[in-house]
Amino acid sequence: MALRKELLKSIWYAFTALDVEKSGKVSKSQLKVLSHNLYTVLHIPHDPVALEEHFRDDDDGPVSSQGYMPYLNKYILDKVEEGAFVKEHFDELCWTLTAKKNYRADSNGNSMLSNQDAFRLWCLFNFLSEDKYPLIMVPDEVEYLLKKVLSSMSLEVSLGELEELLAQEAQVAQTTGGLSVWQFLELFNSGRCLRGVGRDTLSMAIHEVYQELIQDVLKQGYLWKRGHLRRNWAERWFQLQPSCLCYFGSEECKEKRGIIPLDAHCCVEVLPDRDGKRCMFCVKTANRTYEMSASDTRQRQEWTAAIQMAIRLQAEGKTSLHKDLKQKRREQREQRERRRAAKEEELLRLQQLQEEKERKLQELELLQEAQRQAERLLQEEEERRRSQHRELQQALEGQLREAEQARASMQAEMELKEEEAARQRQRIKELEEMQQRLQEALQLEVKARRDEESVRIAQTRLLEEEEEKLKQLMQLKEEQERYIERAQQEKEELQQEMAQQSRSLQQAQQQLEEVRQNRQRADEDVEAAQRKLRQASTNVKHWNVQMNRLMHPIEPGDKRPVTSSSFSGFQPPLLAHRDSSLKRLTRWGSQGNRTPSPNSNEQQKSLNGGDEAPAPASTPQEDKLDPAPEN
């Protein structure tokens, strides 16, 4: 039941956010989306087809016949299982829907709350609000939450300032008896109660209070824990909840290292200092004993007291400390309210008794005065009554005489009335006979009108059938006209598409023709290169033949006497120079044979005195015959 009330508070905000006109009604399409999101976030299995059936546009579904609240109870809240979903995700869904419409943070960035802080304060408001709609938080709970946030920041506010602030808010909320959530968030955003506090400090304090009240974190902090296998000490971040003691690798709580379940049979004991550790204590469960060490004696005392409180809650069968405290505060407020109401009722009763006493005294004085006036009036009335009696007696005597005369005239008039009555009876008899004849004529006329009405109804039905057939013919004609127009449009689109494809085909043909021309030019270039290559090969062969002829040794001739005049121009080094030039030519010829480039052809032409044939390549035999190096 408590979980259902908490879920209903968040769903109420989502529903009112969808109710734009403030009429208490929301469209079925929006309710269908809301229900689907609730099914998803609450991990309730559902059939999408059945969901569509429930929110049909007709008036046969359960939502149309019963309203959304019975549907919400029957199909959603009755199927919720505690622990099967993450309540924070559910609250985030409802906050997202209501914050888009109702929550407006300062666009200049002067607000004290971030969106996450506003969401957590919204959750805290729902937790501490009354179980009445629209949801409000009474000033006592506002004071309690403010003190919690300020104590988390290690700040203290004077009692006078707090009472002044709450008095201002009470004046704002005096019509409703408390603050709405948007007034509550505006109180934090304005910074009136948080002068000199930074946004980061406030965010950390709100997060700590959120963990304590919503997530039931009784205490958290670093402790040294002794392992069970290696028996070494490691520092861990511990979080104490009513049902367990969890420990993590760091305070971000991303890596859970273990969990210590707590029940009514667990206990906590203080241990003496040993192994270099001080302020030690242990938690004994049914299966294992966990040894821990705090930083100082105060921390150890706080941890042991908090763990004992969690064990006490388990023994009493309670799941949340702050839910129990909230219920106790509510009962105390109700007792104070009853005492105050009883006191006010007693004061009101005493005031009414005093007023009643004063009123009776005034009535007594009035009665005495009225009695004196009544005596005086009674005397006057007695004298007036006597005179009136005399006058009345005289008047009665005169009336008696007039009555005797009237009786005589009345008898004569009665005789005339009897004669008139006899005539009236005869007239009534005639009228009854006439009425009977008129009724018979009326029945005949009614029958004729009924026959006429049946004929008219038949004619109307025939006219309606003819109009229906005419409408069908007109609809058929309109469909044929639309079909003709659509066919004409499709024909025009097809013609445009064919024209576009024709243009694309022409462009493709032009590109193909250009490619063919480029290919033809490339083929011509290849053929020219091949001709040049063949010509170069022929020239190389021709040059090799000439070089082979030049390489034959010159046979010695007949010896002749040498004169100084005959060999005056002979210089032996020139022959060696010629041989080296010949080797160089053969080497250039071999390079030209490997790579017939235009530059090598030009070099060979320059060496051969303008001959177009390239230098022949040297053969392996020639390299073996003349291995002398170049100069």
Swiss-Prot record:
Record-linked SUPFAM superfamilies: EF-hand, PH domain-like
Any GO MF annotation of the entry: guanyl-nucleotide exchange factor activity
Disulfide bridge map: none
Positions with biased composition (Basic and acidic residues): 331-341, 513-523, 621-631
Residue ranges that the Swiss-Prot or TrEMBL entry lists as coiled coil: none
InterPro entries tied to this protein: EF-hand-dom_pair, PH-like_dom_sf, PH_domain
PROSITE patterns recorded: PH_DOMAIN
Compartments, record wording: Cytoplasm; Cell membrane; Nucleus; Cytoplasm, Cytoskeleton
Post-translational modifications reported in the UniProt record: Tyrosine-phosphorylated by tyrosine-protein kinase LCK in response to T-cell activation.
Ranges of compositional bias, category Polar residues: 535-547, 588-607
Ranges for region Disordered: 318-341, 397-417, 494-631
Residues annotated with Phosphotyrosine modification: 210
UniProt keyword terms in alphabetical order: Acetylation, Cell membrane, Cell projection, Cytoplasm, Cytoskeleton, Disease variant, Membrane, Nucleus, Phosphoprotein
Tissue: Broadly expressed in the immune system. Highly expressed in T cells.
Composition skew (Low complexity), residue ranges: 499-512
CDD domains per UniProt: PH_SWAP-70
Comment on protein domains: The PH domain is essential for phosphatidylinositol 3,4,5-trisphosphate binding.
Name this protein carries in UniProt: Differentially expressed in FDCP 6 homolog
Organism of this sequence: Homo sapiens (Human)
Lineage, highest ranks first: Eukaryota, Metazoa, Chordata, Craniata, Vertebrata
Gene that encodes the chain: DEF6
